[in-house]
């Protein structure tokens, strides 16, 4: 094409320069000025990587003054184009010479980019289409928000998360027993609410000792990056913001941090939150006349925040008043009077009894049938009652139907979820091995001196000190005193590890210093490979230590953990636990054992406790084992008895040589424990457990998600994405890949990929066994960010390919069009479950015939060959008119396709939301726990979703020209 001064061209390789203007021409070279960035480029007149910018009738262009022109005629004058049309701002006729076009003009529409020569690679076009297709499919998946969790697929957890996570502003109490995964359930609910757009700002309030555990769990299991707020972080943020809590979207802080400072609390309340999560909610003390400050703090927040999750392991039978107080936080209108609550709870007793009868093998007698009929009086259940006394499948189905109806009437079933170990199978036995050892003379001397000097110390401080004689010894002999040279526990540990070379052993001690000193001794004395885990390490260092311990071949035999360092980490692959010392309270003891005693533990757990005779350790060991049975069984009564008997226990620990009535004390504690445990068992709410367990629904959920694990489409797409984005991949093993950033990535900083890289796997079990490995699913940030990177920009939006096919004439033109049907709506409506951005593929010949249904994308794509950009531009210029004709013809086809998709989405939304509304209204008639705002929310949601679907539109997302060749 001949060059003329003033013509506008665009660079094929540097599109960011904007529109160029021809400012100089000689026999061999042409100079372009790019006014938008003030740069010149010198090109050869032959084969220059530039494309002439020419607009067509129907296009809208912008002048350098900012006004827009709708083109209705194009005139050429001495090689320069003049565009005639109507100004959009004044609606008057106007003309615009090409030299006055906006210098910053960019080409966003795929066809504009194609005609402007900004043609992309063929593999990127294919990636874009796959990204559209897979993203659309993922939004429609029923298990959205649950599949990407880095956790085992445990039915009762999935059931609770699915049941609660889909609700509008859920307000529930998660009260599973210790070890059943309340934190994971809460994390799954948060993850779902965030993914569905129902929540963005989340506040988690926990005891100070659990902050890091939550931080680790949220990041490692759900890829949720929370910020930890303490005094220093708050003060630091106060310099940049009037309200520090508005500087982050997701925050974890301690209850003490909130309670201690009035200004801080006010800032917390003023910040707008979508969800509040409170762990260890049983510590919120309440009475009708004198609620505690902690309770009042959470109450104020719960009133202001629409969604609330409370977590507690304390059963309601151990304190009906505190149980009522927790329910009151969730729904103060419903739970406003304690006495009324007690009366109401008693009314539900017959409902639970009826379920127990239906679960038994016995036939229902007349009295029992009449009782159930009265409870479900608004429906005719006579046929179901008759069928329940028959045999076979009919009996089972009818009983299940009756149980389901009774569950709908359950008092707090919708707000409260509680699973017990007796109701959930899959837990190992716990076996205690207590090893008594003589107290070394060095310790005896140090303890005597400590007792003399501790006269002014409180009993509590003395009791805690007495548990750790090595620390007492070092206080007097100096930090470098080598207590490990004479402490018999060290010799025992060396022998134990040597005798169990093939076992992974977790050793927990109270202090980080003890763990570090033990590692040195094991390494120097016996060459035992040990990893250390303590609170002074970063998350990355802890991950590496955990991975070193988990590794089968070259890994550590033993992991030495401090109390705080081990929080939030579970090591089910090990079954040997050594407690080098004992923690001060039963909650911490259970937390230690809980590192191994989880669902998924396949072997019995051996708990070895080497203890020194005549010390506070021996006192505490007896109390835990004989008084609470806390080693070999979970101990739901432990905290209550600990609080009741605290003063006496501290007294015995502070003076272990003056035990006096200690045997009676042990008997008394065991009696309390047995009585409470019996009360718990008798008061077990089978109906609530059935409701919380999820039964077959939970199992089905787990199976469906398991079927989607290791999805070959995901693996192929992810590897293709990494290649095209420019991420380095190195195979570490059959299932592990190391990803690292490269210097030639599509973006300099790929979101979700650390600067020093990361190890990934598509296999859930591998991810669970290695702390340093990320589990890649469609929900992982690396994949989600990759999809966004491709689809939010122009990557792959236009391409040109050659098709070698001798059955077709040379030069035959096919146009492949990817349209997208979509609707815009606020995130919280979660419109994508009915109409995600849905790709529609058309493959048109010049006659307007659509061949897409006969020619599948992947097999067709494999037959095509790439074309370099310069040749592509020439081909496009040669067939520009034909392509315009095909685009015009495609619109009527697309109109019909879009109409069908939108109608289907409206029908699906109407059916789903009407069904949900009917279900809630029917439940509200028999169960007062259905909040009015839930029903109203569904009604509003239905109206808004149908309105937004009415406004759904379609647009061209990508275009590819295919030219037939025989070469």
Curated annotation (Swiss-Prot):
Keywords: Activator, ATP-binding, DNA-binding, Helicase, Hydrolase, Nucleotide-binding, Transcription, Transcription regulation
Highest taxon above the source species: Bacteria
InterPro entries (UniProt xref): Helicase_ATP-bd, Helicase_C-like, Helicase_RapA, P-loop_NTPase, RapA_C, SNF2-like_sf, SNF2/RAD54-like_C, SNF2_N
Domain (Helicase ATP-binding): residue spans on this chain: 163-333
The keyword Membrane is assigned to this record: no
PROSITE patterns named in the record: HELICASE_ATP_BIND_1 (PS51192), HELICASE_CTER (PS51194)
Span(s) of short sequence motif DEAH box: 279-282
Residue numbers binding ATP: 176-183
MF terms (GO), sorted A to Z: ATP binding; DNA binding; helicase activity; hydrolase activity, acting on acid anhydrides
SUPFAM superfamilies with a match to the protein in the record: P-loop containing nucleoside triphosphate hydrolases
Family: Belongs to the SNF2/RAD54 helicase family. RapA subfamily.
Record note on quaternary structure: Interacts with the RNAP. Has a higher affinity for the core RNAP than for the holoenzyme. Its ATPase activity is stimulated by binding to RNAP.
Known role: Transcription regulator that activates transcription by stimulating RNA polymerase (RNAP) recycling in case of stress conditions such as supercoiled DNA or high salt concentrations. Probably acts by releasing the RNAP, when it is trapped or immobilized on tightly supercoiled DNA. Does not activate transcription on linear DNA. Probably not involved in DNA repair.
Protein name per its UniProtKB record: RNA polymerase-associated protein RapA
Species of the source: Proteus mirabilis (strain HI4320)
Gene behind this protein: rapA
């Amino acid at each position: 094409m001949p060059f003329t001064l003033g013509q506008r061209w665009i660079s094929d390789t540097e599109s960011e320069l904007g529109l160029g203007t021809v400012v100089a021409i000689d026999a061999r070279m042409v100079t372009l000025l790019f006014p938008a960035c003030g740069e010149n480029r010198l090109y050869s007149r032959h084969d220059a990587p530039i494309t002439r910018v020419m607009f067509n009738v129907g296009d809208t262009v912008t002048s350098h003054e900012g006004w827009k022109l709708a083109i209705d005629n194009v005139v050429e004058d001495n090689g320069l184009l003049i565009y005639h049309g109507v100004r959009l701002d004044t609606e008057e006729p106007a003309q615009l010479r090409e030299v006055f076009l906006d210098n910053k003009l960019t080409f966003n529409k795929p066809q504009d980019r194609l005609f402007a020569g900004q043609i992309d690679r063929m593999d990127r076009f294919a990636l874009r289409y796959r990204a559209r297709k897979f993203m659309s499919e993922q939004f429609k998946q029923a298990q959205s928000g649950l599949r990407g969790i880095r956790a085992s697929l445990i039915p009762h957890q999935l059931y609770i998360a699915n049941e609660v996570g889909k609700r509008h502003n859920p307000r529930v109490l998660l009260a599973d027993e210790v070890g059943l995964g309340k934190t994971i359930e809460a994390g799954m609910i948060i993850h779902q609410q965030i993914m569905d757009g129902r929540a963005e700002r989340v506040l988690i309030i926990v005891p100070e000792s659990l902050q890091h555990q939550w931080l680790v769990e949220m990041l490692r299991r759900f890829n949720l990056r929370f910020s930890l707020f303490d005094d220093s972080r708050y003060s630091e943020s106060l310099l940049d913001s009037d309200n520090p809590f508005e500087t982050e979207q997701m925050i974890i802080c301690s209850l003490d941090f909130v309670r201690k400072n009035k200004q801080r609390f006010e800032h917390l309340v003023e910040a707008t939150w979508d969800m509040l999560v409170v762990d260890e909610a049983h510590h919120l003390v309440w009475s009708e006349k004198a609620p505690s400050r902690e309770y009042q703090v959470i109450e104020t927040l719960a009133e202001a925040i629409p969604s609330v999750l409370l977590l507690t392991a304390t059963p309601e039978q151990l304190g009906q008043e505190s149980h009522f107080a927790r329910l009151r936080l969730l729904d103060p209108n419903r739970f406003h009077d304690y006495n009324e609550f007690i009366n109401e709870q008693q009314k539900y007793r017959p409902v639970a009894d009826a379920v127990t009868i239906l679960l038994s093998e016995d036939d229902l007698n007349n009295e029992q049938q009449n009782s159930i009929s009265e409870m479900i009086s608004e429906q005719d259940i006579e046929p179901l009652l008759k069928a329940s006394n028959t045999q076979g499948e009919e009996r089972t189905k009818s009983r299940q139907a009756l149980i389901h109806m009774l569950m709908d009437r359950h008092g707090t079933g919708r707000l409260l979820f509680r699973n017990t170990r007796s109701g959930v199978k899959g837990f190992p036995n716990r076996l205690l091995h207590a090893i008594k050892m003589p107290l070394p003379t060095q310790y005896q001397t140090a303890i005597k001196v400590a007792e003399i000097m501790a006269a002014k110390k409180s009993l509590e401080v003395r009791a805690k000190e007495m548990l750790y004689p090595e620390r007492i010894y070092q206080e007097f002999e100096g930090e470098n005193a080598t207590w490990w040279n004479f402490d018999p526990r060290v010799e025992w540990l060396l022998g134990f590890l040597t005798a169990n070379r093939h076992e992974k052993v977790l050793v927990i001690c109270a202090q980080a210093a003890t763990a570090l000193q033990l590692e040195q001794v094991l390494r120097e004395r016996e060459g035992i490979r040990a990893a250390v885990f303590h609170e002074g390490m970063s998350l990355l260092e802890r991950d590496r230590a955990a991975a070193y311990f988990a590794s089968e071949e070259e890994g550590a035999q033993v992991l030495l953990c401090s109390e705080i360092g081990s929080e939030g980490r579970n090591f089910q692959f090990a079954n040997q636990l050594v407690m080098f010392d004992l923690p001060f309270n039963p909650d911490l003891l259970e937390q230690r054992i809980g590192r191994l005693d989880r669902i998924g533990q396949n072997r019995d757990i051996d708990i070895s406790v080497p203890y020194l005779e005549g010390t506070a350790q021996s006192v505490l060991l007896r109390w835990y084992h004989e008084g609470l049975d806390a080693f070999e069984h979970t101990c739901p009564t432990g905290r209550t008895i600990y609080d009741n008997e605290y003063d006496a226990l501290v007294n015995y620990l502070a003076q272990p040589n003056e035990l006096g009535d200690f045997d009676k004390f042990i008997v008394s504690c065991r009696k309390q424990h047995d009585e409470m445990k019996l009360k718990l068992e008798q008061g077990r709410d089978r109906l609530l457990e059935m409701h919380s367990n999820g039964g077959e629904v939970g199992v089905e959920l787990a199976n469906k998600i398991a079927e989607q694990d290791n999805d070959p489409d995901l693996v192929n797409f992810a590897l293709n994405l990494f290649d095209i984005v420019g991420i380095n991949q190195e195979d570490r093993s059959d299932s592990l890949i190391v990803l690292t950033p490269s210097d030639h990535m599509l973006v300099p900083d790929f979101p979700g990929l650390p600067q020093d890289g990361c190890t990934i796997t598509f296999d859930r079990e591998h991810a669970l066994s290695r702390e340093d490995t990320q589990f890649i699913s469609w929900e992982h940030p690396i994949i989600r960010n990759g999809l966004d990177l491709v689809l939010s920009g122009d990557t792959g939006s236009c391409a040109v390919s050659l098709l070698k096919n001798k059955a077709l004439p040379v030069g035959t033109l096919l146009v492949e069009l990817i349209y997208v049907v979509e609707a815009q709506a606020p995130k919280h409506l979660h419109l994508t479950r009915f109409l995600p951005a849905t790709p529609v593929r058309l493959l048109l010949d010049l006659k307007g015939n659509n061949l897409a249904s006969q020619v599948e994308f992947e097999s067709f794509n494999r037959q095509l060959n790439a074309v370099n950009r310069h040749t592509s531009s020439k081909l496009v210029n040669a067939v520009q008119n034909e392509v315009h004709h095909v685009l015009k013809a495609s619109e009527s086809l697309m109109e019909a396709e879009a109409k069908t998709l939108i109608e289907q989405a409206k029908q699906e939304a109407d059916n789903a939301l009407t069904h949900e509304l009917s279900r809630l209204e029917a439940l509200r008639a028999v169960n007062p726990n259905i909040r009015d705002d839930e029903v109203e929310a569904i009604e509003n949601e239905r109206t808004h979703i149908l309105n937004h679907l009415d406004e759904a539109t379609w647009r061209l997302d990508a275009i590819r020209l295919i030219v037939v060749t025989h070469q």
